[in-house]
Amino acid sequence: LKKVNVSLRPIVSNINLPTVIKTAVLPGDTMESIFVATQVGEIFYIRNRIARLFLDIRQRIIELGTNGGYDERGLLGLAFHPNFYYNGLFYLHYSKAGTQGQGALSGSFHPNPCEPETLSLRWVNRNTQYDHIDTVEEWILQPSGQSQRRRTLLNLRRPFLNHNGVNNLNFSPETGRLVLTTGDGGSGYDPFNLSQNMMEIAGKIIEIDVNTDILINNLPAVTRFNELPEAVQRTLTVIVKGTRNIPGIAFQRYNNQYIKYVGNVGQDLVESVFSFTYYKPIPVTEIISASTQNRSLNEDGLVNLGWRGWEGDLPTPIINPCLSNPSLVEETIAYYNEAISVATKRILPLTCYYHMDPRPDKFSGTALTGIQPYMGSEIPDLTGCIVFIDFVRRGSTPARGVLAYTKVRTECKLNDYSIIEPNYNFGTQSAYYVSLGANLTQSRLYLGVYGSSNVTDFNQGTVFEIV
């Protein structure tokens, strides 16, 4: 794959950290507007390079940056109903104000194969030992132009502050359902192995039938599917497990089907992009029924990304400096038994890139923060390709994110990828690549850049169009 050169055209600047970039046609309007959600809780819509406030829910968002400025909570998801133009419905995912807890573990977690008890921890006392509560809500844009919350779809109790997913609400053009992409709940190495446990909500991609109009007041905050009211259980199906942290799901029309793209943010070594076409959703009611009857669940057709046994294309490693030479590192398999157990159940990544990569035409990355297919024609070298971004190139000073791309999978092997070089001068300012969005036809791509890794360093965001 060859290196591709692009330009970046600024659309809006001096905003807070952009977590979601999408387009939609407002009711009564004739053209798409660009919508940008910020982590702190604002949603703007942009037309003719003028940003107007669509919604401000900053008072509803948990206090961010209390750990030094970096945070993975906040307003993380925004999706517009397929019939938004007619019904005004849209959906939000955010971390709720006033729900700060103490966390599920007092310290950091590191698995150690020589200490088997570290490989089988359980999340106990969940009602008190959690970090925060995330909510998924349905809102409606009223004819007056004001938006109002209609109902809560889910309240999720999260064990740690990180790995909540980002850009984590998207509608499936195949099923018309709302797709929630959740991370494994955080810390590191998935301490409680939530992502492989089918009863756990964490670490899954879930489809929600929003057309079943269920209104339940005071919906409980839950961690497992069987804690949900039965009426809510009936609206949910699981399509993917084994996620670690995930920047949304994207759909690419290909012949008469859709290819789905999802990414797993890596632990210490591997960032992965996955693609799949076929899947068989498993109703949550079936998961609960199998558990209640103590029978094994038929997971045929369920997509498994392999985490925590696998980090992309490698068994999840623990990286330590060599005792004899601290400038070198050794990689130890963290969860050997889990890796061989999941090996035949997982799908293989479409492409991977690494935190340490000496190859001259590659880069050493940090965290995958967005994936979008590009179906436009203005950048012909990228037409039909899958574009992805990394938060920050390792060792770059000042900090610079990375744009890259790969192609649709045609062979049963790991795809190569190549770097996209943006012709833009950020000067001495840091440029962390935090979000990647597209318009409705995927003919335009939008890049969210932030001047700091800390959400509480306010108003350092720019959204660009990639041209």
PLM features: residue spans?
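Asp-box/WD-like beta-propeller blade repeats and closely related beta-sheet repeat scaffolds
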Residues: 103-170
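Beta-propeller domain segments
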Residues: 65-68, 73-75, 85, 97-98, ...
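A short helix->beta-strand "capping" segment at the edge of beta-propeller domains
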Residues: 1-17, 146-151, 232-234, 420-422
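Blade-loop segments of beta-propeller domains
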Residues: 50-80
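Beta-propeller domains
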Residues: 1, 30-58, 143, 400, ...
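Beta-strand-rich domains and repeat architectures in extracellular enzymes and scaffolds
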Residues: 10-41, 365-375
